[in-house]
Amino acid sequence: MIRLPLALALIVVALLLPLAAAHADGIADTAEICSACHGPDGKPVDPSIPVLWGQNEGYIYLQLRDFKLGNRTNPVMGPIAASLEKQDMKDLAAYFAAKPWTNLEQPRAPSDVALHAETVASSAGCKGCHLGNWQGDSVTPRIGGQGLSYLRETMAQFRDGERKNNPWMVALLKTYTDADITAMASYLAGQ
């Protein structure tokens, strides 16, 4: 069931996308379309939508490219990315990466949940790519402080093979239980 704010955002995007393609005067105008879902202040309108403000530039570009190529699927992002040229994707990635990270003010995980998550992360080597502070690097996403629902859904999609644009993550998360995913999402969201 689509939540009301998400449904409204989808309607706004559907109405504005053709106008943006025809009349965009710059990347800030194009980015306004993104704000219908990802939020005008960097806080997404729905918990299942990721924070873009302050996300790593290379990662944003790769995701837009994957949506455009069909390597990553989403009924909203697929058509949006399909309308973008390579330079548009690079410009959008730079635009959002330059914004300050949005603090969603999510609570820290309880100590037992944090311990479970740290154990899972250590055994899987998560910090090898996402780094010690969960900030990622150029092409690896920042996941510390990302939305709880988005984190949980994304990890489950990788584990279940629904999201395939990163074969390493599919293989890594294949062994995660629901409890592991819930603990990791709670822990990461509160970072």
Where are these regions (language model features)?
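Positively charged n-region of N-terminal signal peptides that target proteins for export
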Residues: 1-4
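C-type cytochrome heme c attachment motif
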Residues: 30-40, 62-65, 90-94, 122-131, ...
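Inter-heme linker and motif-flanking segments adjacent to c-type heme-binding CXXCH motifs
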Residues: 43-44, 98-112, 133-141, 159-166, ...
